[in-house]
From Swiss-Prot:
Gene that encodes the chain: hisH
Swiss-Prot/TrEMBL catalytic activity: 5-[(5-phospho-1-deoxy-D-ribulos-1-ylimino)methylamino]-1-(5-phospho-beta-D-ribosyl)imidazole-4-carboxamide + L-glutamine = D-erythro-1-(imidazol-4-yl)glycerol 3-phosphate + 5-amino-1-(5-phospho-beta-D-ribosyl)imidazole-4-carboxamide + L-glutamate + H(+); L-glutamine + H2O = L-glutamate + NH4(+)
Protein name: Imidazole glycerol phosphate synthase subunit HisH
Record carries keyword Transmembrane helix: no
Location of the protein in the cell: Cytoplasm
SUPFAM superfamilies, per the entry: Class I glutamine amidotransferase-like
EC code(s) of this entry: 4.3.2.10, 3.5.1.2
Provenance organism: Cutibacterium acnes (strain DSM 16379 / KPA171202)
Role, per record: IGPS catalyzes the conversion of PRFAR and glutamine to IGP, AICAR and glutamate. The HisH subunit catalyzes the hydrolysis of glutamine to glutamate and ammonia as part of the synthesis of IGP and AICAR. The resulting ammonia molecule is channeled to the active site of HisF.
């Protein structure tokens, strides 16, 4: 029997740490949660969670050395999973409540308020897989979203799996080199979310 995948969850002060840790353990990962970058270096993959305001998450991440850790990690081609605001933090920048936020610049795109009459987008939604998706091809399940901001896209994309809320199509997930990220919460998406996390872990082993 092979050793479990060791996953480090970055604790920058604004994330669903308990839910993410529990879900990853359910699918067989060994999980370490830490706000010390040096404690996370000896893992097989990182998870960048995030809830609340993008600016607050970025400030917390920079303060604990996580921004430098993420960029170094991705530059080395090591696998990383962003969740919800953690997904948004991976893009170039964001604009939230008239505040411009410089993000990590790992993924191309800008986070903005979704052009929809009813916000937040909260509840279950289906996704349209990216043309070269390894994780979502053939997936019919719905995933749990709760957000008002996202990266709006038009048309099919090689790296972005999309979802639509009230006519606004946005990035629901990204698969970009070593980086995977989801706007939805896999850890709150029941069986579908656990299956997705299992597929992600299987890519690492």
């Amino acid at each position: 029997m092979s050793d479990p995948v060791r996953v480090g969850i970055i604790d920058h002060g604004s994330g669903n740490l308990h839910s993410a840790r529990r879900a990853l353990r359910q699918v067989g990962a060994e999980v370490i949660v830490s706000n010390d970058p040096s404690a996370l270096l000896d893992t097989d993959a990182l998870v960048l969670p995030g809830v609340g305001a993008l600016a607050v998450c970025m400030t917390g991440l920079r303060a604990m050395g996580g921004a430098r850790l993420v960029r170094q990690w991705v530059d080395e081609g090591r696998p990383l999973l962003g969740i919800c605001v953690g997904h948004q933090m991976l893009f170039e920048r964001g604009r939230e409540r008239d505040v411009d936020v410089k993000c990590l610049g790992v993924l191309p795109g800008v986070v903005e308020e979704l052009p929809a009459e009813r916000l937040p987008h909260m509840g279950w939604n289906t996704v349209t897989p990216a043309t070269d998706s390894a994780l979502f091809q053939g997936v019919q399940e719905r995933f749990y979203f709760v957000h008002s901001y996202g990266v709006v896209v038009t048309g099919p994309h090689d790296h972005f799996t999309t979802a639509t809320h009230q006519g606004a199509t946005f990035v629901a997930a990204a698969e970009y080199g070593p980086v995977t990220s989801t706007q939805f919460h896999p850890e709150k998406s029941g069986i579908a979310g656990l299956a997705l996390l299992t597929r992600w872990l299987n890519q690492l082993s």
